[in-house]
Design a protein with these regions (language model features):
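Membrane-proximal loop-to-helix boundary features in eukaryotic membrane proteins
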Residues: 8-12, 16-17, 21-30, 118-119, ...
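Extracellular-facing/secreted segment signature in eukaryotic proteins
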Residues: 24-155
Length: 228
């Protein structure tokens, strides 16, 4: 069990496996294979979901717009890993009405076509090539997680108040969601869990090393002695 607020286990085996990677690469996949991989998230009425699966069809689709100060811009491009960008392609029959496409399921967040705005998450393409979607499809390891939404690429003076307009499309029931503004460096964003994990493992290894040193000093092993 997980005490309130309810946690979102994006790495649950049934959830993370509910997808078809060949379909996400833009390949044609037969319906029986899609049903095997995506279960009840394969069809919407008599139309095939493209993409299918629980991960794609639970996309976080809140919209954040930086409205103040006017001198700052929220850049939503280049937020996905370069390796991930290469794994998502729209198929040759993109737009076929026998399928229900991502831009129909999430019209506020996902456009159909590529954007000409270099700061847009759809600068590389619409549909499954939208970077917000690609970021979401990389499963988080922990039940409390963050997903990169955009970047402010200018220094912000201390004391500056940021005002965001939020369109809350993603329904939550006894869960928490938040907009976090943080500073990143070449190692990534602030992550207390990862830091304490490294400290814990380091202390554990240090204690073991001390124990082995004490053992070697008090009861040394003779070279070639089979008793040890």
């Amino acid at each position: 069990t997980c005490a309130l607020p309810i946690c979102f286990y994006q790495n649950h085996r049934l959830y993370v496996n509910s997808r078809d990677d060949n379909q996400l690469r833009g390949e044609e996949v037969d319906l029986s294979t899609l049903k095997s991989n995506c279960g009840n998230k394969t069809m919407d009425g008599d139309r095939i979901l493209n993409p299918c699966g629980s991960v794609a069809n639970s996309l976080f689709n809140d919209i954040y717009t930086l409205v103040s100060p006017m001198t700052l811009t929220l850049n939503e491009s280049h937020i996905a890993w370069k390796y991930d960008l290469e794994k998502f392609k729209n198929p040759s029959n993109y737009g076929d009405p026998s399928y229900k496409w991502l831009y129909e399921s999430y019209p506020d967040l996902i456009p159909k076509e590529k954007s000409e705005d270099s700061a847009s998450a759809s600068f590389n393409g619409g549909g499954v090539q939208n970077e917000h979607f690609i970021v979401w499809m990389r499963a988080a390891a922990l039940p409390r997680f963050r997903k990169l939404y955009g970047r402010i690429e200018r220094d912000i003076p201390a004391g500056t108040q940021l005002e965001f307009q939020v369109k809350a499309n993603f329904f939550v029931n006894n869960m928490e969601k938040a907009l976090v503004v943080t500073t990143t460096n070449w190692l990534g964003g602030r992550n207390l869990f990862l830091g304490w994990s490294y400290v814990g493992v380091g202390v554990f290894c240090l204690l073991f090393a001390i124990a082995f040193i004490v053992k070697q000093l008090t009861c040394p092993r003779k070279l070639g002695d089979v008793k040890y």
